[in-house]
C-alpha cells in the first residue's frame, strides 16, 4: 500500500476523492476507510455530493465505495460519480507589488493551512447542543452558554460566541477562532485551553475578534482592518 494514494478535497457540501490510477483498488478502499476513521465524528451531519477522479472504477467498485462512505462516515451521501471535468490550469500571473504591509498579519495567521471542506450552520447553537465538523465551521448565528462548537479547522461565528469552542481539534495549532463578539466560557485551539477574563471590557459596539496560538499561548485580538 502506498501512503498518500488518496486525497480528499472539498468545498461546501461537496467532496472530491483523488485516487492514484496505479494503486490497487482494495488498498484505496482501506485508505479511504482509514481517513474517515481518523476524522472521528466530524463527518456526521454533513450532506455531501461526492466525486472521484484519477482511477477508473467499475459499477461494482463504485457501489462499494458509495456503501463505504454511506456506512462509515456518518454523513448523508447524496450522490457519487466520476469527476469528468478537466482541472482548471491557473494562468501565469506576473509578479507585481502586493502591498505586503496591509496583508502581513493575514499571511501570518493562515500560514500552512490547506483548503478543506467548510460547513455552514444557520441558526443559534443553544445550551446542550453540539455542532461539529471535520474542516472549517461557520456559524451564522450565536453560540449560547452551554452550547458547543468543534472543528478540525477554523471556527467562525457570525454573532456572539458565549459557549464552548474547539478549533483545530485534530491537533492543528494554526487554526483560528473568529467571532463578532468573543466571550466563550471555554476556548480551545488544538491542545491549548483558555478562557477570557471574568470582567472583559465591553463597549457599545462589537468588533470582530480572533484567537490564535503563538508561542504555545492563546492570544485574542480585535480585528480592525487597515483603512
From Swiss-Prot:
What protein family is recorded? Belongs to the MinC family.
Asked if the keyword Cell cycle belongs to this entry, the reply reads yes
User: What HAMAP family does its record include?
Assistant: MinC (MF_00267)
Q: Which residues cross the membrane?
A: none
Q: Does the keyword Magnesium apply?
A: no
Function in brief: Cell division inhibitor that blocks the formation of polar Z ring septums. Rapidly oscillates between the poles of the cell to destabilize FtsZ filaments that have formed before they mature into polar Z rings. Prevents FtsZ polymerization.
Q: Name one GO biological process term.
A: cell morphogenesis
This protein's name:
Probable septum site-determining protein MinC
Assembly description: Interacts with MinD and FtsZ.
Origin superkingdom: Bacteria
Species in which this protein is naturally found: Acetivibrio thermocellus (strain ATCC 27405 / DSM 1237 / JCM 9322 / NBRC 103400 / NCIMB 10682 / NRRL B-4536 / VPI 7372)
Gene for this chain = minC
